[in-house]
Amino acid sequence: MFQDNPLLAQLKQQLHTQTPRVEGVVKGTEKGFGFLEVDGQKSYFIPPPQMKKVMHGDRIIATLHTDKDREIAEPETLVEPFLSRFVGRVQRKDDRLSIVPDHPLLRDAIQCRPVRELTHSFQNGDWVVAEMCRHPLKGDRAFQADLTAFITNGEDHFVPWWVTLARHNLEREAPAMVESALNDAELEREDLTALNFVTIDSASTEDMDDALFVQDNGDGSWLLTIAIADPTAYVVENSELDLTARKRAFTNYLPGFNIPMLPRDLSDNLCSLRPNERRPVLVCRVTITEEGTLSNDIRFSAAWVESKAKLVYDDVSDWLEGNNRWQPQDTAIAEQITLLKRICDARSNWRQQHALVFKDRPDYRFLLGEKGEVLDIIVEHRRIANRIVEECMIAANVCAALALREHLGFGIYNVHTGFDPALVEQAASVLKANGVDADPQALLTLPGFCELRRHLDALPTQFLDSRIRRFQTFAEISTVPGPHFGLGLEAYATWTSPIRKYGDMVNHRLLKAMITGQQAEKPQEEITVQLAERRRLNRMAERDVGDWLYARYLQPQAGTDTRFTAEIIDITRGGLRVRLLDNGAVAFIPAPFIHAVRDEVVCSQETGTVQIKGETVYSQSDKIEVRIAEVRMETRNVIARPVA
């Protein structure tokens, strides 16, 4: 009777149209229910039965209903699934496979099956790559995934590395070597092999890509020659090797080992500036005045050099600091070290007055055993030899930025524009509330930004510095020149690490075109997108492996009385994020660990403070003592508790 009834169809359509709908992102909880967060402002309750249709992180459209004075969201349409490609662990039960995604808020096993090409016999605990293929909001009965790749078994000691690389879809191996010979016969090279070039690196470094030589001009100035390894002499543009390097974009440095951008025979041998080996290079010569100014006589050329010594950071630093456990091999090398130290001091003073100098932060290096276990974490402070190399490389990159800008008008530039114009008023308000008057428009200029940074660096704590960082833009990679506010420089283009960075290889080719007077093509914008994306993925991979190793390292300390000094690096509504200064690990302190009565404690990201009953007890950048309360190995989270 009601079949094909137009009135009934009209009524259904009317009800459907009148039902309120919202679009948002599903937030799961450990208790089965969830919330639909809309624009970060409002959230709606999703009951457990409805949560079975969705997954944490899904973007959906939901209908809104009222139940006992509470608005409830009922998932209706999938806009964008949270999971597409992911990694997880296999569960095997009676020949039936399921996979638990490796994510802190995804605990439920998902039915899965291997794709036809995958012949591996899966066992409990295996790590795999999977692709979601079914979703309840797409009309399927349940979630289902296809297993697309086997990563490793659950007992592999190197799980942190292999799983992380698979998660971010990054290479595990060095590229294969192909037949390579010098291919730039038309490029005239000066013979500088008689000069006393030296390299300064870590003791374990094999891919030495920069060598330095200084000549004292006798009038208080120096002529600095920076020689940079020349892989583009072997790698033809658009060749198989070049396309591989372009895809990888960077050498991927992970705790314990690296995955190079170029084949190891190139990066660690043919191109590496090994001592007493003749190597093709690009060189930059520039006069540096006694005050540290770069003169206008910048000159780039191609050359042959022969490094006379592979020096090590700690050896050089010890010798310059008067510790004579190590000595330079001869007076010529000793003279080079002494002259490089003078250049470093002059350039550092110039940058402090006219640009910006980053505050020294230690590096943390994992000392690993044969099975990937963390034996120790070494704190490596930046010493004078590190600063020598840093000052010379910054000078070289400024020279390239200016030369490319003047001769070509393009290149691969590192650009940082300081404050976001949309947020600069907020930054000025935060500064004013903390006793610093700043004109928002002046903050958007390079001199204004530098003046503020110098003022903040002179303050006794980093509280204000950390508070205004969120109003700043991120550094970008650009094909056109632009300022680098973070360094306080009007232009910055790197070319000093072409073995490790594809953008530097691009700049090498442009510099060669400039040297020979040939026509040069502006790099495609797609290259900057690829470089930025790969840089992001490599950083995430380094962080993820680090988190895993920190969790392993700190697990024995959980629940003990061992104290750690920590710096508060972030304050969120739920608690504090701190960095342990002894080893670099990041831990979370939940708000209830700060004060038992939850309503009396306010953790505010806005003010960068924690207040108990209206009194400020902690501020961002404070140093506090903590103990490790718990290490959650499945999520690699370290939970800490303040020492009372």
UniProtKB/Swiss-Prot annotation:
SMART domains: CSP (SM00357), RNB (SM00955). It catalyses: Exonucleolytic cleavage in the 3'- to 5'-direction to yield nucleoside 5'-phosphates. Belongs to the RNR ribonuclease family. RNase II subfamily. One of its GO terms (cellular component) is cytosol. This is Exoribonuclease 2. It is an enzyme of class 3 (hydrolase). Keywords: Cytoplasm, Exonuclease, Hydrolase, Nuclease, RNA-binding. Residues 561-643 form the S1 motif domain. Its EC number is 3.1.13.1. GO terms for biological process: mRNA catabolic process. NCBIfam families: 3_prime_RNase, PRK05054.1, RNase_B. It holds the Pfam family OB_RNB. Involved in mRNA degradation. Hydrolyzes single-stranded polyribonucleotides processively in the 3' to 5' direction. It comes from Yersinia pseudotuberculosis serotype IB (strain PB1/+). The keyword RNA-binding applies. GO terms for molecular function: exoribonuclease II activity; RNA binding. PROSITE patterns: RIBONUCLEASE_II. The keyword Lipid metabolism does not apply. It is found in: Cytoplasm. Residues 189-516 form the RNB domain.
